[in-house]
Amino acid sequence: MENELVSKVKAPVPGNQTNTLNEAKCPVGAHTLAGARSNANWWPNQLNINILHQHSPLSDPMPEGFNYAEEFKTLDLDAVVKDLRHLMTDSQPWWPADYGHYGPFFIRMAWHSAGTYRIGDGRGGAGSGEQRFAPLNSWPDNGNLDKARRLLWPIKQKYGRKLSWADLMVLAGNVALESMGFKTFGFAGGREDVWEPSEDIYWGPEGKWLDDKRYSGERDLENPLGAVQMGLIYVNPEGPNGKPDPAAAAVDIRETFARMAMNDEETVALIAGGHTFGKTHGAGVPTEYVGPEPEGAGIEEQGLGWKNKLGHGHGYHTITSGLEGAWTTNPIKWDNGFFDNLFGYDWELTKSPAGANQWTPKNGAGKDTVPDAHDKTKRHAPFMATTDISLKVDPIYGPISKRFHEHPQEFADAFAKAWYKLTHRDMGPLPRYLGKLVPKEPQVWQDPVPAVDHELVNDSDVAALKAKLLASGLTVSQLVTTAWAAASSFRGSDKRGGANGARIRLTPQKDWEVNQPKELAKVLPVLEKIQHDFNAQGGKKKISLADLIILGGCAAVEEAAKKGGHSVKVPFTPGRTDASQEHTDVKSFSVMEPKADGFRNYHQKGQPRPAEEMLVDKAQLLRLTAPEMTALVGGLRVLGANYGHSKHGVFTSHPETLTNDFFVNLLDMNNRWQPSGADGVYEARDRQGDHVKWTATRVDLIFGSHSQLRAFAEVYACNDAKEKFVHDFVAAWTKVMNLDRYDLAKKKAAAN
């Protein structure tokens, strides 16, 4: 897809906006001004837990109980597609369509909505309509996509809450492809809009657009980032840092697309398929003609940016990337024109009217073969970006490109599946996919699990299985740790992981260091024996290992609460199934291996971020609130869930008993804390006798150090909070155990 890098735009510092308001302080608004110093300004090293409080119902305009999935099911999808097809050629004078067709524009919009996804932490992607908000709406690479969304507004307005912006942007890309003769693989609805920018996504360390401080060494890109520069979706089309070196650009392409979960064939298919359509825009030098991005524009622009002073400011005079030209002879039709031109000409370096580095056929070849986008009397030669030439000269991409050129149907199939993957990668498992256009064929990247094909266990079965689990010789610690390891692999970002599928018994999860493979190898056979014995009783009733792992954890929590004097029933709902190794993409799952899990007091050495920061990041991926995170850490410590049976943070003389001892002893003023000789480890000494009472990590001590977390800890340390703590822990535990149970959400919605 066209990468509209605004390489020549004056680079504003993110956050520096034109203040069009009267700067005289109003007595009402004086304390809400953006310029006021925040706590983060005063104490930049303070742990930020705000990411655990984002997307609150208080910022959601939808009514209480609103269920987008149910609303989408009532949508007339055929009517939406019909309206989108009409829009494709309904050129508007305020933003005329290139070649009379908006298709390429909407493909770019959908691509850039989805293309922010990165596998490192699962964040980014098209799943929540974030392109509407800062910073994405003002990224240089998203130049003029504000107009694409405004073109879609009448359709969004027509269908209202039945159709989210997130779904509409992807669907518009699909319909655009279909309207130009391409057969897509499918489309799923189900992306629910957010109503504020997500604060948990780390876009990079840079303080200005198009900077690249994210690199170290020769060209080592910081994890989990995917793009090469701040404000780009993926790579610089002119080449690394604007240097027109196709071989070097191929290195960037391979790394960036791999971090978007794409292999070499998918990468070639996506670039070539996207560049079969449309053109780039560089009618003039951006710094001379183009105004501020949407977030920096004046209030009268009403959320639009990049106002262009050249000529009409649109159409023939459009300026976006600084690159100028089309790749094919028919930019609004699916064909093999991209490869025809890539291999049909020898290419030489030239400059666009804006001064950007790009390529043109040597010796004037190809002259007048490409129509002008707005003037039928004009013709042009085709163009290629440096990153397009990479697909020809790279020793891996080159043969793939040649094969696709010689086998057009193979190319079409590859692009269809790669586009589907690109636009659906962050949607999670198939139960979240909605609508009549969903393909029946599951893809391995969707982490498929088998459908339930047996009768589920009832309450009496559950009670009997709990008794067997507790009498199996496995400890409370082992049962809790195994259930947590399985369930906490979930990522709310791209909805991957979780206990369903019991992939903790498969490669690679069974070998992850954090899961203590030797210990896991002792626990799983015991659970498998209990499962086998139950399922061998005959009849249709069975239990999966995935269900049994979670049931074991629930039984252990109940037992630990009982030992602490509290009778509690931990909710358990069967219905999980066991995935196969064949349906588990090892490479894709490998990137999910935790480098830290503060809930288990695990932190790999050499991590650039402090342990407490990684705890908050983990909690956010688990969709936990700060109080839920607090309750879980305190409970898991006394239950003995620490990695390697470490005693750090186990502030109790009654291990494997669910008590509030962690909080009581952490806040005990008879203790004084000091660093120990070990890195990242602290010790509590009695103020009177000076003997060591406890040891702790930074994750443990943050609940006494951070003022807000300490406030939560104080709640649970109070004398009247013992029962409250147990119930809060059970509620948070149950939430984590069921994070991947989208089937339960569907049943709940159907019941309502």
Swiss-Prot record:
Entry annotated with the keyword Metal-binding: yes
PTM comment, free text: Formation of the three residue Trp-Tyr-Met cross-link is important for the catalase, but not the peroxidase activity of the enzyme.
Crosslink position(s): Tryptophyl-tyrosyl-methioninium (Trp-Tyr) (with M-260): 111-234
Positions of the catalytic residues: 112
Binding site for heme b: 275
Cofactor: heme b
Chain positions covered by the region annotation Disordered: 1-20
Record cross-link Tryptophyl-tyrosyl-methioninium (Tyr-Met) (with W-111), residues: 234-260
Recorded catalytic activity of this chain's protein: H2O2 + AH2 = A + 2 H2O; 2 H2O2 = O2 + 2 H2O
Domain of life: Bacteria
GO MF entries: catalase activity; heme binding; metal ion binding
Cofactor binding summary note: Binds 1 heme b (iron(II)-protoporphyrin IX) group per dimer.
GO cellular-component term (any): cytosol
GO biological-process terms attached to the record: cellular response to hydrogen peroxide; hydrogen peroxide catabolic process
Subunit structure, interactors included: Homodimer or homotetramer.
HAMAP family attached to this UniProt entry: Catal_peroxid
Annotated function: Bifunctional enzyme with both catalase and broad-spectrum peroxidase activity.
Family: Belongs to the peroxidase family. Peroxidase/catalase subfamily.
Protein's UniProt name: Catalase-peroxidase
Taxonomy of the source species: Bacteria, Pseudomonadati, Acidobacteriota, Terriglobia, Terriglobales
Protein's gene: katG
